[in-house]
Amino acid sequence: MSIMLTVSEVARKLGLNPQTLYFYERIGVVDHPQRNQSGYRVYQEKDLAILSFIRHAKDLGFSLEEIADILHLQSQQSLTCDEIYHKLTSKILQLESGIKEMEKMKDDLSKILSLCCQRISNGGKHGNCCLLNEQLT
């Protein structure tokens, strides 16, 4: 007999908020789970595997739309290794671009911090600091 878990049991097991499960269902990322005799949602092992995949894919930076697309292709048995290769390559390029943007932001902040340190060492510890306004305009 397969396991049947409630929303709270699944949420606890996967470290998710129960509302997240309802949200995934509402937007169509996952199918509606079965209901028990009392009308409560119950999840089987296959549902748990899908929800675990979603959580892991989100941790890797995939959007819910991208995840839904992957799950749809998989359910149609048309998810090829080539398709996954292209999705992973695209995701890596997006991440690399984001890393470059963050490195530039860090460099910009470091420059402002350096100016701040100079002003502090020149006795500018007190009073209104307008350094951010000067640097951000």
UniProtKB/Swiss-Prot annotation:
Keywords: DNA-binding, Transcription, Transcription regulation. GO terms for biological process: positive regulation of DNA-templated transcription. Residues 8-27 bind DNA. PROSITE patterns: HTH_MERR_2. The keyword Cell cycle does not apply. GO terms for molecular function: DNA binding; DNA-binding transcription factor activity. Residues 4-73 form the HTH merR-type domain. This is Uncharacterized HTH-type transcriptional regulator slr0701. It comes from Synechocystis sp. (strain ATCC 27184 / PCC 6803 / Kazusa).
